């Protein structure tokens, strides 16, 4: 809106008085910084008089006037009539405040009413610097709300107002560097909200604002780097504030002196996985890739830990010296990759620096130790199958432990097989306590049934048996329940399952496929119609086996109800195999019962047979280990079944992941 000198004089006449220079209110909480004019087009805003006094930028003295609900609602709705009401009532607009300390300009800026903001600025320029109870200026409020046009208008107004004053008078009046109660500037809110156009306007208005940190030690520059590729050009504009001819060390010193809070910009770029921003930072300040963060990690270690392959290669292309720089905990970048199971990064390290595979941490552990210790089974598997790293399996740390020792200590059954089967020498090695991996497993396994411990022990013993290193009589040991009450609940659950199987199979025996001969004129009245059908015979055979096995299970488990621990163990050793057998016979009986009825439909017969066969095998590999690992004696030859079960688990997990992915895609499309 345009105005003349006469209009400004009219507005000045409406004011009761002007405060003097020594009565002004100090609104700055962060020190003054000179401003530069913003670039880019902005909305036209009221022009200030060239002879603007400092007193024009501060509110009238006196107490605040409580904002009425009518004025609050009207300003929130963008109604200019509210200003006229305030004028007609003689209410000083500068003193009208809500219960949260918001001025009328705060409210108009919060809801993005551009024209109302312009008019308020024209009449009350002092409100540009007014802060609410949260120490936020209208510029804070507008940026937080994401109103770019309003922000541009406020920035242009502030720049015009300060330009009309002398340098001495304008010092300390820069709202671009004012911080709210959380220590955030308006620029921080713009970047946090990912408003690129708005952030660019604010950066152009004040080049020092991006370096100010909040109460959490996060600066606007840090937040811009964390925003990723979208803010690449803005980060470049912020960092390109010095002459290229200045020495890099001097530029780095200048950056450190200006940047408040967290200074690990390269780490943040890696976290954001923004290769463009990383290039901007390292091109301008190459030494940042050698710095360590608050956890003592170099850029390479941090990139390896999060698995950012492109960023890590970018750093390695610049320099590989960081590969041999350890963190504060004594680990090298290649150890971070092994710990977090990023095998492709390990390969990249070894490709560029072959000697890095021999690096040891403070515990004397190599990458295979670290992988085994942290249950990174896939990494351990790949390293043991690589001829260049396979020999690391016999390495011993400061305690004499091999990777296999550490895997056993952590009961990592996934790593056991590859570590023990790919290098038989590892089975013979003893640590400084004189213990082999087998000794640790057998001594540390708990007496009560804990699946992953007994599973690990069984796989280790099978690997020893397969290698021929020493004899193994059994893959399991006797388990003793610690709580008889919990064991009784387990027995009761088995009784319920066995009773259900017996009931279902008993009923199925009298509702056979094809029914019975009901015609009195035909021979064999009341006999099965398909009695001579071989598939019906198989149906009846497995149905009877399932029923009889379940009944035998019930009879056996009745003994377990007496509470005698020895009887419980012996009953379970008999009942569990019987129940497993009955559960497997039941689906076979069902399959042949269906085949009897639909044998003439070939395609349906094949489909049902394939589906049933798959789930039958799945049931074997799910229920089998549960029964086998509870037996006091399991011959070593059973180990092949356990290894196959491991493969089944991996396939099942992959199948579940695929199903989730498919349903996720369907959900996204909907």
Curated annotation (Swiss-Prot):
<feature type="transmembrane region" description="Helical">
    <location>
        <begin position="538"/>
        <end position="558"/>
    </location>
</feature>
<dbReference type="GO" id="GO:0050826">
    <property type="term" value="P:response to freezing"/>
</dbReference>
<keyword id="KW-0472">Membrane</keyword>
<feature type="region of interest" description="Disordered">
    <location>
        <begin position="18"/>
        <end position="47"/>
    </location>
</feature>
<feature type="repeat" description="ANK 10">
    <location>
        <begin position="399"/>
        <end position="428"/>
    </location>
</feature>
<dbReference type="GO" id="GO:0009751">
    <property type="term" value="P:response to salicylic acid"/>
</dbReference>
<feature type="transmembrane region" description="Helical">
    <location>
        <begin position="493"/>
        <end position="513"/>
    </location>
</feature>
<keyword id="KW-1133">Transmembrane helix</keyword>
<feature type="topological domain" description="Extracellular">
    <location>
        <begin position="559"/>
        <end position="577"/>
    </location>
</feature>
<dbReference type="GO" id="GO:0005789">
    <property type="term" value="C:endoplasmic reticulum membrane"/>
</dbReference>
<dbReference type="GO" id="GO:0042742">
    <property type="term" value="P:defense response to bacterium"/>
</dbReference>
<keyword id="KW-0677">Repeat</keyword>
<keyword id="KW-0812">Transmembrane</keyword>
<dbReference type="GO" id="GO:2000031">
    <property type="term" value="P:regulation of salicylic acid mediated signaling pathway"/>
</dbReference>
<keyword id="KW-1003">Cell membrane</keyword>
<comment type="function">
    <text>Dose-dependent activator of the defense response against virulent pathogens, including bacteria, fungi and oomycetes, that acts in a positive feedback loop with the defense signal salicylic acid (SA). Regulates the salicylic acid (SA) signaling pathway leading to cell death and modulating cell fate (e.g. cell enlargement and/or cell division). In response to SA signaling, triggers the accumulation of FLS2 at the plasma membrane, thus priming defenses. Involved in SA-dependent freezing signaling and tolerance.</text>
</comment>
<feature type="topological domain" description="Extracellular">
    <location>
        <begin position="478"/>
        <end position="492"/>
    </location>
</feature>
<dbReference type="GO" id="GO:0071446">
    <property type="term" value="P:cellular response to salicylic acid stimulus"/>
</dbReference>
<dbReference type="GO" id="GO:0016567">
    <property type="term" value="P:protein ubiquitination"/>
</dbReference>
<dbReference type="GO" id="GO:0016020">
    <property type="term" value="C:membrane"/>
</dbReference>
<feature type="transmembrane region" description="Helical">
    <location>
        <begin position="578"/>
        <end position="598"/>
    </location>
</feature>
<dbReference type="Pfam" id="PF13962">
    <property type="entry name" value="PGG"/>
</dbReference>
<feature type="transmembrane region" description="Helical">
    <location>
        <begin position="603"/>
        <end position="623"/>
    </location>
</feature>
<dbReference type="GO" id="GO:1902290">
    <property type="term" value="P:positive regulation of defense response to oomycetes"/>
</dbReference>
<dbReference type="InterPro" id="IPR002110">
    <property type="entry name" value="Ankyrin_rpt"/>
</dbReference>
<feature type="repeat" description="ANK 4">
    <location>
        <begin position="182"/>
        <end position="211"/>
    </location>
</feature>
<feature type="topological domain" description="Cytoplasmic">
    <location>
        <begin position="599"/>
        <end position="602"/>
    </location>
</feature>
<feature type="transmembrane region" description="Helical">
    <location>
        <begin position="457"/>
        <end position="477"/>
    </location>
</feature>
<dbReference type="InterPro" id="IPR036770">
    <property type="entry name" value="Ankyrin_rpt-contain_sf"/>
</dbReference>
<comment type="subunit">
    <text>Component of large complexes containing, at least, FLS2, HSP70 and ACD6 in endoplasmic reticulum, plasma membrane and soluble fraction. Associated with HSP70 proteins during endoplasmic reticulum-associated degradation (ERAD). Reduced complex levels upon benzothiazole (BTH) treatment.</text>
</comment>
<feature type="repeat" description="ANK 7">
    <location>
        <begin position="295"/>
        <end position="325"/>
    </location>
</feature>
<feature type="repeat" description="ANK 1">
    <location>
        <begin position="66"/>
        <end position="95"/>
    </location>
</feature>
<dbReference type="GO" id="GO:1900426">
    <property type="term" value="P:positive regulation of defense response to bacterium"/>
</dbReference>
<dbReference type="Pfam" id="PF12796">
    <property type="entry name" value="Ank_2"/>
</dbReference>
<feature type="topological domain" description="Cytoplasmic">
    <location>
        <begin position="514"/>
        <end position="537"/>
    </location>
</feature>
<feature type="topological domain" description="Cytoplasmic">
    <location>
        <begin position="660"/>
        <end position="670"/>
    </location>
</feature>
<protein>
    <recommendedName>
        <fullName>Protein ACCELERATED CELL DEATH 6</fullName>
    </recommendedName>
</protein>
<dbReference type="GO" id="GO:0009617">
    <property type="term" value="P:response to bacterium"/>
</dbReference>
<keyword id="KW-0832">Ubl conjugation</keyword>
<feature type="topological domain" description="Extracellular">
    <location>
        <begin position="624"/>
        <end position="638"/>
    </location>
</feature>
<dbReference type="GO" id="GO:0005886">
    <property type="term" value="C:plasma membrane"/>
</dbReference>
<keyword id="KW-0256">Endoplasmic reticulum</keyword>
């Amino acid at each position: 809106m345009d105005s003349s000198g006469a209009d400004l004089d009219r507005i000045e006449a409406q004011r009761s008085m002007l405060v003097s220079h020594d009565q002004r209110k100090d609104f700055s909480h962060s020190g003054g910084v000179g401003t530069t004019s913003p670039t880019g087009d902005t909305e036209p805003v009221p022009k200030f008089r060239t002879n603007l006094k400092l007193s024009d930028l501060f509110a009238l003295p006196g107490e605040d006037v409580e904002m009425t609900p009518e004025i609050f609602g009207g300003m929130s709705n963008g109604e200019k009539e509210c200003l006229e009401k305030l004028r007609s009532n003689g209410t000083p607009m500068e003193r009208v405040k809500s219960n949260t300390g918001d001025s009328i300009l705060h409210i108009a800026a919060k809801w993005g009413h551009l024209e109302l903001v312009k008019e308020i600025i024209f009449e009350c320029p002092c409100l540009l610097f007014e802060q609410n109870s949260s120490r936020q200026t209208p510029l804070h409020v507008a940026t937080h709300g994401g109103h770019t046009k309003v922000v541009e208008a406020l920035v242009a107004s502030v720049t015009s107002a300060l330009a009309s004053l002398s340098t001495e008078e304008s010092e300390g009046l820069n709202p671009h560097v004012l911080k709210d109660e959380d220590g955030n500037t308006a620029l921080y809110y713009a970047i946090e909200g990912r408003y690129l156009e708005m952030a660019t306007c604010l950066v152009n208005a004040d080049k020092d604002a991006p370096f100010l940190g909040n109460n959490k030690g996060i600066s606007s520059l840090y937040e811009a780097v964390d925003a990723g590729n979208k803010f690449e050009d803005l980060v470049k504009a912020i960092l390109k504030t010095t002459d290229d001819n200045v020495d890099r060390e001097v530029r780095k010193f200048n950056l450190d002196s200006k940047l408040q809070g967290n200074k690990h910009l390269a780490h943040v770029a890696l976290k954001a996985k923004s290769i463009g921003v990383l290039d901007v930072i390292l091109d301008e300040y190459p030494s940042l890739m050698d710095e360590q963060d608050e956890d003592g990690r170099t850029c390479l270690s941090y990139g390896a830990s999060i698995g950012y392959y492109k960023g890590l290669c970018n750093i390695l292309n610049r320099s590989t010296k960081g590969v041999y720089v350890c963190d504060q905990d004594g680990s090298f970048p290649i150890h971070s990759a092994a710990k977090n199971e990023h095998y492709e990064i390990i390969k990249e390290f070894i490709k560029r620096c072959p000697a890095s595979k021999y690096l040891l941490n403070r515990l004397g552990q190599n990458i295979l130790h670290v992988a085994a210790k942290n249950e990174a089974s896939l990494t351990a598997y790949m390293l043991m199958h690589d001829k260049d790293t396979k020999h690391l399996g016999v390495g011993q740390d400061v305690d004499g432990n091999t990777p296999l020792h550490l895997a056993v200590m952590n009961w990592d059954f996934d790593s056991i097989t590859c570590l023990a089967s790919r290098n038989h020498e590892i089975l013979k090695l003893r640590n400084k306590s004189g213990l082999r991996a087998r000794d640790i497993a057998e001594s540390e396994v708990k007496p009560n049934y804990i699946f992953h411990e007994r599973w690990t022990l069984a796989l280790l013993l099978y690997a020893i048996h397969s290698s021929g290193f020493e004899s193994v009589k059994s893959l399991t040991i006797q388990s003793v329940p610690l709580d008889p009450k919990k064991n009784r609940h387990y027995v009761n659950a088995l009784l319920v399952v066995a009773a259900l199987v017996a009931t279902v199979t008993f009923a199925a025996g009298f509702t056979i496929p094809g029914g019975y001969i009901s015609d009195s004129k035909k021979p064999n009245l009341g006999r099965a119609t398909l009695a001579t059908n071989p598939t019906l015979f198989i149906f009846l055979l497995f149905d009877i086996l399932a029923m009889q096995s379940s009944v035998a299970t019930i009879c056996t488990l009745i003994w377990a109800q007496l509470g005698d621990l020895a009887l419980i163990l012996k009953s379970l050793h008999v009942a569990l195999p019987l129940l497993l057998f009955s559960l497997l016979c039941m689906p076979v009986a069902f399959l042949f019962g269906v085949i009897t009825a639909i044998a003439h439909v070939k395609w349906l017969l094949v489909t049902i047979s394939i589906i049933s066969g798959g789930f039958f095998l799945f049931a074997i590999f799910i229920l089998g280990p549960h029964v086998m690992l509870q037996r006091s004696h399991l011959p070593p030859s059973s180990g092949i079944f356990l290894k196959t079960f491991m493969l089944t688990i991996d396939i099942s997990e992959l199948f579940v992941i695929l199903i989730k992915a498919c349903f996720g895609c369907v959900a996204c499309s909907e």
